[in-house]
């Protein structure tokens, strides 16, 4: 449904048209999964795509996409690290962002989430990523979003965020 909301109004230009300034979009977690698909779709439509990855050097598929879409650039972002979020904001100072796609989420190992074998440090990381990181990224990039024309924020997640849809999880700790 969210895909339909963000893409309901297609860009006002065709991919073959010359546009003075295509819209800018930032996609977090663009190195794989849904984030990669979103970054790819926006790049194919001619948008200026800022695609973030926790480990850009390991994001071979995303780097290949950037090689075929010159309007796609890759930025380092570790959404679990406040300093990394702040550094991204500093690097993007003055850069308008029309759409921010917050694509974050991690599941972790089942045995780290059970009473009796809880790894508190890892669980803290899961909670920080799943519950707080999108908010922190949005907060830091708010000036960029306000400077954009569309001013849209999309929050997406995969099945890892739904325990009902992922029955193998035995994580009463959530």
Per-segment meaning from a language model:
Residues 24-27, 100-101:
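Conserved hydrophobic beta-strands of the Rossmann-like cofactor-binding core
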Residues 31:
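Conserved glycine-rich cofactor-binding loop
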Residues 45-61:
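Conserved glycine-rich Rossmann-like NAD(P)H-binding loop of the short-chain dehydrogenase/reductase
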Residues 66-83:
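Rossmann-fold cofactor-recognition segment
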Residues 138-139:
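A short, exposed helix-loop element centered on a Lys and neighboring polar residues
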């Amino acid at each position: 449904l969210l895909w339909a909301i963000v893409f309901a109004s297609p860009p006002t230009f065709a991919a073959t048209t010359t546009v003075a300034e295509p819209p800018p979009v930032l996609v977090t977690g663009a190195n794989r999964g849904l984030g990669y698909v979103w970054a790819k779709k926006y790049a194919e439509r001619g948008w200026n795509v800022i695609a973030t990855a926790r480990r850009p050097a390991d994001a071979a598929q995303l780097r290949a996409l950037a090689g075929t879409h010159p309007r796609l650039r890759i930025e380092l972002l570790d959404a679990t690290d406040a300093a990394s979020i702040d550094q991204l904001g500093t690097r993007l100072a003055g850069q308008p962002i029309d759409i921010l796609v917050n694509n974050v989420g991690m599941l972790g190992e089942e045995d780290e989430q059970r009473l009796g074998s809880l790894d508190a440090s890892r669980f803290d990381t899961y909670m920080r990523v799943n519950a707080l990181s999108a908010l922190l990224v949005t907060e830091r990039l708010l000036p960029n979003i306000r400077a954009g024309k569309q001013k849209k924020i999309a929050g997406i997640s995969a099945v890892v965020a739904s325990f009902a849809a992922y029955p193998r999880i035995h994580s009463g700790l959530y």
